[in-house]
Regions:
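N-terminal glycine-rich FAD/FM-binding segment characteristic of electron-transfer flavoproteins
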Residues: 1-176
C-alpha cells in the first residue's frame, strides 16, 4: 500500500516537471511541460519545480530556470547518465515520497511512456496519459483539500467530476 495513505492532502505542494535529457541535451518536451506547469502552478499558487536526472547535468538546470521553473532539483550520478527504467524510477519515487508534489508532469516520449506508469504504480497513484491541455478547477480543488483529512480513497467523496480536467489529442501529442 502507498506511503501516502492517511497522509493529509495539504502536505502535497507544488507542480513538478520531469525534465528529460539525452546525452546532456534537454528535450523539446521539457520546455512544453515547463510552460504548461507554469500555468498550473500559477493557478494553484504553488511553486513550479523541475526534476532533472543525469550525470554532469547541473548546467542544464540553469537553462530550465530561464523557461519559468522556480526551482530545479538535480539528481546526479554516473549511473543516471543514460536512462534505465529501474534507476530513474527509484530516484524519482524516492524524491517524490520525500518532497510530496501535488502534480507531476512527464512527457509522452518513449522514456516518459515507460517511466510514468512505473512511477504511478510504485507510488500507488493515478496516471492520466496523452493530455494536450490541463485545467484545474481551483475552487473545487481547494474545497476538497479543506474537507478531506486523509488520502485514503475509501474516505474520499467526489461530486460531479474530477478537479483536474484534460483533453486527449486526436492524432498524438507530447504531454502526459
Amino acid at each position: 500500500m502507498s506511503t501516502f495513505v492517511n497522509t493529509d492532502p495539504t502536505a502535497f505542494k507544488g507542480v513538478w516537471v520531469f525534465c528529460e535529457q539525452r546525452e546532456g541535451k534537454l528535450m523539446p518536451t521539457d520546455f512544453e511541460l515547463i510552460s504548461e506547469g507554469r500555468k498550473l502552478a500559477d493557478d494553484l499558487g504553488v511553486e513550479l519545480c523541475g526534476l532533472l536526472l543525469g550525470d554532469k547535468v547541473e548546467g542544464l538546470a540553469k537553462e530550465l530556470g530561464g523557461y519559468g521553473a522556480d526551482r530545479i532539483i538535480v539528481c546526479e550520478h554516473p549511473l543516471l547518465k543514460d536512462y534505465t527504467t529501474d534507476a530513474y524510477t527509484k530516484v524519482i519515487c524516492d524524491v517524490v515520497m520525500e518532497k510530496k508534489p501535488e502534480i507531476m508532469l512527464i512527457g509522452a516520449t518513449n522514456i516518459g511512456r515507460d517511466l510514468g506508469p512505473r512511477c504511478a504504480a510504485t507510488l500507488h497513484t493515478g496516471l492520466t496519459a496523452d493530455c494536450t491541455h490541463l485545467d484545474v478547477d481551483v475552487e473545487k480543488y481547494k474545497a476538497f483539500l479543506k474537507t478531506t483529512s486523509t488520502m485514503d480513497v475509501d474516505n474520499m467523496k467526489f461530486d460531479e467530476g474530477t478537479h483536474l480536467k484534460m483533453t486527449r489529442p486526436a492524432f498524438g501529442g507530447h504531454l502526459m
